[in-house]
Amino acid sequence: MSRLFSDVLPEWPLDEVEAGLASVTETDVLVALELAENGRRLNARDFMALVSPAASPYLEMMARIARDVTVRQFGRSIQLFTPLYLANYCTNQCVYCGFNTKNHIHRSMLTMDEVEAEGKVIAATGLRNILLLTGDAPKLTGPAYIAEAARRLRPYFPSIGVEVYSMSEDDYRMLVDAGVDSFTMFQETYNEELYLKLHPAGPKRDFRFRLNAPDRAARAGMRSVNVGALLGLDQWRRDAFYTGLHADWIQATYPGVDIAVSAPRMRPHEGSFNDIHPASERDLVQYIQALRLYLPAAGITLSTRERPFLRDRLIGLGITKISAGVSTAVGGHAHAAQDAAEEHDTAQFEIADDRDVDQMIAAIEAQGYQPVCKSWEPLDEAYACGKSA
């Protein structure tokens, strides 16, 4: 059987990565920046230099190069999407997540008619990219349930993504056959010892099975594969480095797949987990710019976990995809008028940017960029953000 990313990760032991980050010199950073500016391919050591403490004084130079690289690869366009939470039942005990099975929150699961109602509300905003999410409760929201939801939504959305629990390759293939074309999986942290502490019980505790999920999704025919770590669980520079390695592995191993990276930071949630390794906004900027220089063709997604000012400023510095009109509550689009207390009681985490689609479009245009509401065919409509009747 061919290699998986779980075969690659041990080649970069945690202590060696930590030592490598600490030993980066100013010269190492400048060499990496010169390579990027000249359009040369960066290797893993160059990427390590760019996420190291030694690169922090060079953010302005990184920003200039990252802006140029992004425009060359993607033009002046930003893709828009929104999440649709199908259910928040979960059997895991992730200590940092609002869906933790021990948390006393209101649990719910959409019927197929409710799924379609949510889809209609979202489609009316003009968005044609949607991301389906659930907790990890396969007995309730199994692959067949998610596939049926995708089939119900397919008439409204040319591009449907999933961010759900780890599945088998056959299950991912079932989703592809139902119309799902993109896949997102956060490893949360690449520090296996810490990962096991953060996931004391539940199927998600299987570090290796989750780690290899992007490989299985790519083999199953997903058009786009998105990986990421949740910054704040471990030292951010280590997880940033491993995320870049993971994305590069998928890109090199499955050349027909579009690779993307998300860069979420910890946000307040239901529960008591507070053992956070903070990543500042400046840290996030460094990470995103380093990703752009290391992986010029990769999409980079920024979520509503970040405040509006920062999201707007990052539009020109490497970001290619951004969420809008977000609700992290089950049924949160069709029932947006319900009171804030009920929304808070079912949400996975608190969002920092609550702008709707029209406001996000205006913000993107104010930065001199074109909002893109449809990413796939037909090509002649791909750059329109028109609303449906």
Predicted regions and their residues:
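Auxiliary Fe-S-binding modules of radical SAM enzymes
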Residues: M1-A55, A252-A389
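Conserved, mostly hydrophobic/aromatic
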Residues: G39, A66, C94, L132, ...
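Short, charged low-complexity linear segments at domain edges
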Residues: Y58-Q79
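Canonical Radical SAM [4Fe-4S] cluster-binding loop centered on the CxxxCxxC motif
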Residues: G75-E114
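Generic structural signal for well-ordered alpha-helices
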Residues: T82, G119, I146-A150, Y172, ...
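Core AdoMet radical
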Residues: T101-A217, R223-V227, L231-L233, P255-S262
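Catalytic cores of alpha/beta
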Residues: S168-D177, D234-D248, R307-L317
